[in-house]
């Protein structure tokens, strides 16, 4: 996958990877590496082009950006090509959670915000409200249904956004810095919610302790390229890789080595 912004800056330079259904994978890297840009391609917010022919073979229910001899769309998610033909269905299947909840919230009440997705999927107003209340209950915010979203705390707004994504019943969840700017209590609560979701998850983050806690595999993105991937402990514990790409080995891994 390749992508350049209108000013000519090449943000993605031949990114290739695959995530199997049900995996929880971390995307880590320094600021400006292209992490958010990559995430925005997974539900069609940004159009990309293939760096080489690609296929979805063998990854019909996950995320696939893999070389092939046949020319295919650059990104496949949950068995669908991410292109103009499949845009609405891709956006239903792929839930994208932005880093800043204020980029995602726009309605006058929490309930209306969470119900927006189901309404646009064709549900009746009554059914959309039922789904919204159910999802607000899942994130422990049912009592905030009638409140103005922007009057809530940062962590609460983040949970409203998660409820709005879950209301569309995605099979793939893409999260951009889900714990950024959260206090410890809000972070723990949000991580518990993410941990309990049974779907494919790709998490872009600088919170490497969270990666150790939640993820089975890690991808390192730097300067628009995947420069390392593998089991979380192997990747995050590789001092040479981490240092070369502006990252630090998590403290818990360092302490574990010292104690052993």
Regions found by a protein language model. Name each.
Residues 28-30:
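The feature captures the beta-strand-to-loop junction immediately N-terminal to the Walker
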Residues 43:
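Helix-to-loop junction immediately C-terminal to a conserved catalytic motif
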Residues 126-144:
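Conserved ABC ATPase "signature" region
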Residues 148-152, 156:
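Conserved ABC ATPase signature
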Residues 173-176:
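Catalytic Walker B motif of ABC-type/P-loop ATPase nucleotide-binding domains
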Residues 211-213:
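A short, surface-exposed alpha-helical micro-motif characterized by mixed small hydrophobic
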């Amino acid at each position: 996958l390749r992508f350049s912004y209108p000013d000519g800056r090449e943000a993605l330079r031949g990114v290739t990877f695959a995530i199997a259904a049900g995996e929880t994978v971390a995307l880590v890297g320094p600021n400006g590496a292209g992490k958010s840009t990559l995430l925005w391609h997974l539900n069609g917010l940004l159009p990309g082009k293939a760096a080489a022919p690609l296929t979805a073979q063998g990854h019909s229910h996950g995320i696939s950006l893999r070389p092939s001899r046949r020319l295919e769309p650059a990104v496949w998610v949950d068995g669908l090509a991410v292109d103009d033909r499949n845009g609405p269905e891709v956006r239903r299947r792929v839930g994208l959670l932005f880093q800043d909840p204020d980029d995602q919230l726009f309605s006058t009440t929490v309930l209306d915000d969470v119900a927006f997705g189901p309404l646009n999927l064709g549900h009746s107003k009554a059914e959309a409200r039922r789904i919204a209340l159910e999802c607000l209950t899942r994130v422990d915010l049912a009592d905030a249904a009638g409140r103005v979203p922007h009057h809530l705390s940062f962590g609460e707004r983040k949970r409203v956004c998660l409820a709005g994504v879950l209301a569309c019943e995605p099979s793939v969840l893409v999260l951009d810095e889900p714990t950024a700017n959260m206090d410890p209590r809000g972070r723990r609560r949000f991580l518990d919610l993410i941990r309990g979701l049974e779907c494919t998850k790709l998490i872009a983050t600088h919170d490497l302790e969270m990666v150790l806690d939640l993820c089975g595999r890690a991808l390192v993105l730097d300067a628009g390229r995947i420069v390392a991937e593998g089991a979380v402990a192997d990747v995050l514990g590789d001092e040479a890789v981490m240092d070369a790409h502006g990252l630090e080995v998590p403290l818990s891994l360092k302490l574990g080595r010292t104690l052993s």
